[in-house]
Swiss-Prot record:
Cellular localization per UniProt: Cell inner membrane
SUPFAM superfamilies found in the cross-reference section: ATPase domain of HSP90 chaperone/DNA topoisomerase II/histidine kinase, Histidine-containing phosphotransfer domain, HPT domain
Job of this protein: Component of the Rcs signaling system, which controls transcription of numerous genes. RcsD is a phosphotransfer intermediate between the sensor kinase RcsC and the response regulator RcsB. It acquires a phosphoryl group from RcsC and transfers it to RcsB. The system controls expression of genes involved in colanic acid capsule synthesis, biofilm formation and cell division.
Pfam family, one: Hpt
Post-translational modification comment from the UniProt entry: Phosphorylated by RcsC.
Subcellular location, principal: membrane
GO molecular-function term, one example from the UniProt record: histidine phosphotransfer kinase activity
Lineage, highest ranks first: Bacteria, Pseudomonadati, Pseudomonadota, Gammaproteobacteria, Enterobacterales
Organism: Escherichia coli (strain K12)
UniProt-recorded name of the protein: Phosphotransferase RcsD
PROSITE patterns: HIS_KIN, HPT
Family recorded in the similarity comment: Belongs to the RcsD family.
Keywords linked to the UniProt accession: ATP-binding, Cell inner membrane, Cell membrane, Kinase, Membrane, Nucleotide-binding, Phosphoprotein, Transferase, Transmembrane, Transmembrane helix, Two-component regulatory system
Length: 890
């Protein structure tokens, strides 16, 4: 029992060390309490202000809903009411030019009319003013209403302010600015077709110190301008006294979705943002796209928080000061007292430390001996030193070591040892000896050198073996491929493809050997990157067509960009990576992007992006070690296991590297960074470009394809337009589209799987837009065809047909009616009125048929077909053709 009591007293003793720890714990608790107190006070203040903002938002929303109803009442019932007898006895006073004051018996509200108007507007103003007298009779804050009449474009202002007095000196007063700004806002909203209701930002009435915002509502009237009703809704009576009015802001809500199904959730949502100098508390107004924002400085938050927690905070600070004083006092006292009081824990620690030192000494792979010369005894030694100690004369070893910088060699039992001596810095007459077996180290070094020589020999032998086996396989593989290509059997094509794969693998093995033994040499030539791409595309196009993939070539370099470097190496890199991307992609597309680095014009980046399943981690290891892991495969074969390593090594030979980034299920991006010197521009482009003064209509659905084609054509000097950019009467020379149904006349059909240029109809060609040379050939062929057609059609068109028109006796009627119908075609096409457009085209077709003008009749029939299909680009083209035909007849 006594033993338990003594242990309890020692555990909870009041020694200075224990009291110091208690004070330290108290300081930590007080600091945490202070932080929690401040945080709770700040959160409570923010929560209270958030509730106030929500209440203000509810009040503003209720006011908006009420005055929405009043707006509709004024427009539907009061402004639209016609009472013939009510206009008798009305009187207005002209204050300024186009400014009239309505005289009325009740003076709660006053009304001004701006602009010329009739009696109906005066009567309507009287009714609205009387109605607002009733609504605003008990209000003390200023209210105003603006009514922009769509009938006569007059503006009516009804307000509780003394308008007649304020209007004196109208052009110099603030009322003039307010009325002008309101009229501009209402006219702007009246012209906006997609905006029925809008709100203004928070505004301030200077002489009344009133804050308000404007609710504007538009009412469309057939045959007249839109009518706009605007109310200035004050908020002075909605804001609590402790919140300054100038700190409120009403702004559009960027997060509004437009369908507030849950009204309570929508109105009670509050967001708090901490900016650099202020705190913003905002709440959205339900059924509107606005939100109310209250800005408060950080100083206000700190002052309000300190006022709420001042007494507890002072008490906490006082306790913290006492705890710090006690901690410092008892800490110095405990440090003085423990200097003279021995502790048993020190002895235990020394014992443990000595045991650890003995364990370390016994595990050393060297001999360790610590010798004290004064007492001639060994202080520390391990087994290796104890084994050699009987054969050592430490006195002689010490003397010789002092003469040879502390290092000597000694032979013990025909074994060579190196002995190093160090003098102890703690005990002056104590030496430390380290004994190392030299024979064992020499033997180990010999074995290491022999292993290194054997490794280098094996490496050299492997390289020679791979080179010889590659040379031995190359000739039979080529012979096999040539023989398979000459066969006419049904299986010969498959056999030839497999033979080509074998030849390609042998070539890659030889290239890998040359790169490994550094015997590969670069051949620098001057070449065009675009021409190189035009060679690569046909090589990978069959595999892409076979799998149903889409290929996009996006070359951002200049049209005639010339580079100096190894063309064959770059071609092999692109082929290897694109073939690998085709194999690993089952659906989607493969994109090749070519860019010039912004840092240097001599550095190029080739990016190949696919939409496959991605490359696994094991396949990525093939980037650093050739053919170390298996690769993906499809039903046509396996991906090339040497592609990554060869591409990276060739890119490094070209001064760059290969980078691969992949994501499972999304695809892979292969980035090849190389250095290709740009050719010095000898002569600027002074000559005329290929397609200068040629206008091309590009009707392409895909934005990527449209950008690729537009860049190519503009590099050749053409002007490209789209159906949306084209004017009604604007002509173009060449028509390009990727939709076969849009190719109703001569033009180019763009495709990504065409091997070159193919004729699909008279004056219609199908071309692969990824191949620049094919695109250029197709454009030139189409221009030649169109020039040939123009030579045929330039035969006297107006000869027989003009004579026939004059002989029919209807020439005067033709001149009076047909040009007007052609203008009507342009107008109806601009408004997309297809029904009226069809009637006009049918009427013109009848005129041409009656006069036996067959070309005009055929043009109208084609136009009717395009109208039924709603083909806007085709409609515009044929309207232009009909216009040209009519002008040629006239």
């Amino acid at each position: 029992m006594r033993q338990k009591e003594t242990t309890a007293t020692t555990r909870f003793s009041l020694l200075p060390g224990s009291i110091t720890r208690f004070f330290l714990l108290l300081i930590i608790v007080l600091l945490v309490t202070m932080g929690v107190m401040v945080q709770s006070a700040v959160n409570a203040w923010l929560k209270d202000k958030s509730y106030q903002i929500v209440d203000i938002t509810h009040a503003i929303q209720k006011r908006v809903d009420n005055w929405r109803y009043v707006t509709w009442q004024i427009y539907d019932n009061i402004a639209a009411t016609t009472s013939p007898s009510s206009g008798e006895g009305l009187q207005e006073t002209r204050l300024k030019q186009d400014v009239y004051y309505l005289e009325k018996p009740r003076r709660k509200t006053e009304a001004l009319i701006f602009g010329s108007h009739d009696n109906s507007t005066l009567e309507m103003t009287q009714r609205m003013s009387t109605y607002l007298d009733t609504l605003w009779g008990a209000e003390n804050v200023p209210w105003s209403m603006y009514y922009l009449n769509g009938q006569d474009n007059s503006l009516v202002l009804i307000s509780t302010l003394p308008l007649k007095d304020l209007t004196s000196g109208f052009k110099e007063s603030t009322v003039s600015d307010i009325v002008d700004s309101r009229r501009a806002e209402m006219l702007q909203q009246a012209n906006a077709l997609d905006e029925r209701e809008s709100f203004s930002n928070m505004r301030r009435l200077a002489w009344q110190n009133g804050h308000y915002f404007t609710l504007r509502t538009t009412f469309n009237q057939p045959g007249h301008l839109a009518t706009v009703v605007a109310f200035d809704l004050p908020i002075n009576d909605l804001i609590p006294p402790g919140m300054p009015l100038d700190s409120f802001r009403l702004e559009p809500d960027a997060t509004a979705t437009g369908n507030n199904d849950n009204e309570k959730e929508g109105t009670d949502s509050v967001s708090i943002h901490f900016n650099s100098t202020k705190i913003e508390i905002s709440s959205a107004l339900n059924s509107t796209d606005m939100r109310l924002v209250w800005q408060v400085p950080y100083g206000t938050l700190l002052l309000d928080t300190l006022q709420n927690i001042l007494l507890p905070l002072l008490l906490n600070i006082g306790l913290l000061a006492l705890a710090l004083f006690g901690y410092t006092t008892f800490r110095h006292f405990s440090s003085r007292s423990t200097e003279n009081v021995p502790s048993t824990a020190v002895n235990n620690e020394l014992r443990i430390l000595r045991a650890i030192n003995e364990e370390i000494v016994s595990l050393l792979p060297l001999g360790l001996l610590v010798h004290d010369q004064e007492s001639n005894r060994t202080v520390i030694s391990n087994k290796i030193a104890d084994h050699l100690l009987p054969h050592l004369n430490l006195q002689n070893i010490t003397t010789m070591a002092e003469q040879h910088q502390g290092i000597i060699q000694a032979t013990i039992n025909n074994e060579l040892y190196e002995i190093r001596m160090f003098r102890s810095q703690v005990a002056p007459r104590t030496q430390i000896f380290i004994i190392r077996d030299q024979d064992r180290e020499v033997l180990v070094n010999k074995k290491l050198k022999q292993a290194q020589r054997l490794y280098e020999k094996n490496q050299q032998g492997r390289m020679i073996f791979m080179k010889n086996i590659g040379d031995a396989l190359k000739e039979p593989a080529q012979s096999l491929a040539e023989s398979a290509a000459k066969l006419n059997a049904p299986e010969s094509k498959q056999l030839a493809n497999q033979a080509d794969v074998l030849v390609r693998l042998v070539d890659e093995i030889q290239l890998a050997n040359m790169l490994a033994d550094d015997s590969w040499k670069s051949e620098t030539v001057l070449f065009s990157v675009q021409d190189l791409i035009d060679e690569v595309v046909p090589s990978v196009l069959p595999a892409i067509k076979r799998k149903g993939l889409q290929l996009l070539i996006n070359n951002h370099l200049k049209a005639h960009d010339m580079r100096r470097g190894d063309r064959d190496a770059l071609r092999r890199i692109l082929l290897l990576l694109m073939q690998y991307a085709v194999t690993s992609t089952q659906l989607g597309k493969i994109t090749l992007e070519v860019d010039q680095d912004e840092s240097s014009e001599d550095r190029l980046t080739f990016r190949i992006l696919d939409t496959g399943e991605g490359v696994s981690i094991h396949e990525m290891d093939n980037l650093h070690f050739p053919f170390i892991n298996q690769t993906q495969n499809d039903r046509y074969g396996k991906a090339d296991p040497l592609a990554f390593w060869l591409s990276d090594q060739l890119a490094r030979k070209l001064g760059g590297h290969l980078n691969i980034k992949t994501r499972d299920g999304l695809g892979t991006r292969y980035s090849v960074h190389i250095k290709m010197l740009a050719a010095d521009p000898e002569v600027e482009e002074e000559e005329e470009r290929l397609l200068d003064d040629v206008c091309v209509m590009v009707d392409v659905t895909s934005a990527e394809i449209r950008n690729i084609v537009t860049r190519q054509l503009e590099n050749w000097g053409a002007t490209c337009i789209t159906p949306d950019e084209r004017l009604i009467s604007q002509d173009y020379d060449i028509f390009l589209t990727d939709n076969p149904s849009n190719l109703t006349a001569s033009g180019l059909l763009l495709s990504d799987d065409e091997s070159g240029v193919r004729e699909i109809g008279p004056g219609q060609l199908c071309v692969n837009f990824n191949m620049s040379n094919a695109m250029q050939e197709a454009v030139l062929q189409l221009i030649e065809v169109q020039l040939a057609q123009e030579e045929v059609t330039e035969s006297p068109l107006g000869g027989d047909e003009n004579a026939q028109l004059h002989a029919s006796g209807y020439y005067a009627l033709f001149v009076d009616t047909v040009p007007d119908d052609v203008k009507r075609l342009y107008t109806e096409a601009a408004t997309s009125d297809f029904a009226a457009l069809a009637q006009t085209a049918h009427r013109l077709k009848g005129v041409f048929a009656m006069l036996n003008l067959v070309p005009g009749k055929q043009l109208c029939e084609t136009l009717e077909h395009l109208i039924r299909e709603k083909d806007v680009p085709g409609i515009e083209k044929y309207i232009s053709d009909i216009d040209s035909y009519v002008k040629s007849l006239l």
